[in-house]
Amino acid sequence: MARVTVEDAVNKIGNRFDMILVAARRARQIAVQGKDPMVEEENDKPTVIALREIELGLVTADTLDADERQTVREREAAEIAAVAAIAEGRNAI
């Protein structure tokens, strides 16, 4: 079992409350959304992996925001393409 001290992560983010929010968002990305960890997993849980990524400066609130904006843009582009394909199919009839 990995022992993680959060002091380095707190220092990277600024305060404990924001660190918790960032760690939770990143852990959710890893566990639920299937995002790849940026550090070795070492049989750790997603929350521990998220804290290690924060400690190393690999993850910040800004990087998570940018990643989410990119995901939204990709999803919207896919939806627009799907609607265009449907409309094109109707026009062909």
From Swiss-Prot:
<comment type="similarity">
    <text>Belongs to the RNA polymerase subunit omega family.</text>
</comment>
<dbReference type="InterPro" id="IPR003716">
    <property type="entry name" value="DNA-dir_RNA_pol_omega"/>
</dbReference>
<dbReference type="GO" id="GO:0006351">
    <property type="term" value="P:DNA-templated transcription"/>
</dbReference>
<comment type="function">
    <text>Promotes RNA polymerase assembly. Latches the N- and C-terminal regions of the beta' subunit thereby facilitating its interaction with the beta and alpha subunits.</text>
</comment>
<dbReference type="Pfam" id="PF01192">
    <property type="entry name" value="RNA_pol_Rpb6"/>
</dbReference>
<dbReference type="InterPro" id="IPR006110">
    <property type="entry name" value="Pol_omega/Rpo6/RPB6"/>
</dbReference>
<keyword id="KW-0808">Transferase</keyword>
<comment type="subunit">
    <text>The RNAP catalytic core consists of 2 alpha, 1 beta, 1 beta' and 1 omega subunit. When a sigma factor is associated with the core the holoenzyme is formed, which can initiate transcription.</text>
</comment>
<keyword id="KW-0804">Transcription</keyword>
<keyword id="KW-0548">Nucleotidyltransferase</keyword>
<dbReference type="GO" id="GO:0000428">
    <property type="term" value="C:DNA-directed RNA polymerase complex"/>
</dbReference>
<keyword id="KW-0240">DNA-directed RNA polymerase</keyword>
<protein>
    <recommendedName>
        <fullName>DNA-directed RNA polymerase subunit omega</fullName>
        <ecNumber>2.7.7.6</ecNumber>
    </recommendedName>
</protein>
<dbReference type="InterPro" id="IPR036161">
    <property type="entry name" value="RPB6/omega-like_sf"/>
</dbReference>
<dbReference type="GO" id="GO:0003677">
    <property type="term" value="F:DNA binding"/>
</dbReference>
<dbReference type="GO" id="GO:0003899">
    <property type="term" value="F:DNA-directed RNA polymerase activity"/>
</dbReference>
